Design a protein with these regions (language model features):
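Intrinsically disordered/low-complexity terminal segments and short unstructured peptides
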Residues: 8-10, 40
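C-terminal motif of bacterial Sec signal peptides marking the signal peptidase cleavage site
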Residues: 12-14
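Bacterial signal peptide processing site
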Residues: 16-18
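Central antiparallel beta-sheet cores of small beta-barrel/beta-sandwich binding domains
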Residues: 44, 48-120
């Protein structure tokens, strides 16, 4: 019984391990946020509930403008129910592959770091 408990505990702990962006440092192509989003980008996505049921989908047109150490992302969303939404991100390029971003309708500050072909 103790062995079963130990195995279950180790299994659960392995699920909680952090993904380390550094593990991707040798992967290519190298992802550079400001290069990728400078200009026009189209994206799409969807929201699911916890049971996997599709709740909403969207398309987004993104215009990225780079000015010195700031990348501005102007996002225009169109949802499948016809709703439209806009968001403007101001992303500071901090150096050493680190970023910090804010948007008026988002509480707090987003932070990120890239390594190789990954961004976390």
């Amino acid at each position: 019984m103790r062995l079963l408990f130990l195995l279950l505990t180790l299994t659960l702990l392995s699920c909680a391990s952090d993904m380390k962006v550094k593990n991707f440092e040798n992967e290519t192509p190298k992802f550079v946020l400001e290069d990728y989003f400078d200009g026009k980008t189209k994206a799409w996505g969807m929201f699911h509930d916890r049971f996997g049921n599709l709740k909403r989908s969207f398309k987004v047109d993104i215009t990225g403008t780079l000015d010195n150490d700031t990348l501005t992302l102007d996002e225009k969303f169109i949802y499948n129910d016809g709703e439209k939404e806009s968001r403007i991100w101001s992303i500071k390029i901090l150096g050493d592959n680190k970023y910090s971003g804010t948007a008026d309708d988002v509480i707090g500050k987003a932070t990120g770091i890239s390594s190789g072909n990954a961004l976390n």
